[in-house]
Amino acid sequence: MFTLKKSLLLIFFLGTINLSLCEEERNADEEERRDDLEERDVEVEKRLLSLALAALPKLFCLIFKKC
C-alpha cells in the first residue's frame, strides 16, 4: 500500500510539473502570436502602399487621358 501511495504521489508530482511547463510554453506561444500579428499588419500596409503607388499612373492616365 505504501509503494502505491509513493507511485501515485510521484505521478501527481510529475503531472503537475508537466502542466506548469505546458502553461509556460502556451504563454510564450501567445506572445509570439501577438508579435506575428503586428508584423503581418506592417506587411499588409507595405503591400497596400505599393499597390496604391503602382495604380496611380494608370489612374491619372484614365482621368486626364494623357498617357
Curated annotation (Swiss-Prot):
GO terms for biological process: defense response to Gram-negative bacterium; defense response to Gram-positive bacterium; hemolysis in another organism. Belongs to the frog skin active peptide (FSAP) family. Brevinin subfamily. It is found in: Secreted. Expressed by the skin glands. This is Brevinin-1CDYa. InterPro entries: Antimicrobial_frog_1, Frog_antimicrobial_propeptide. Disulfide bonds join C61-C67. It comes from the Eukaryota. Residues 23-45 form a propeptide. Pfam families: Antimicrobial_1, FSAP_sig_propep. Its main location: secreted. Residues 1-22 form the signal peptide. GO terms for cellular component: extracellular region. Keywords: Amphibian defense peptide, Antibiotic, Antimicrobial, Cleavage on pair of basic residues, Cytolysis, Disulfide bond, Hemolysis, Secreted, Signal. It comes from Rana dybowskii. Antimicrobial peptide. Has low activity against the Gram-positive bacterium S.aureus (MIC=12.5 uM) and the Gram-negative bacterium E.coli (MIC=25 uM). Has weak hemolytic activity against human erythrocytes.
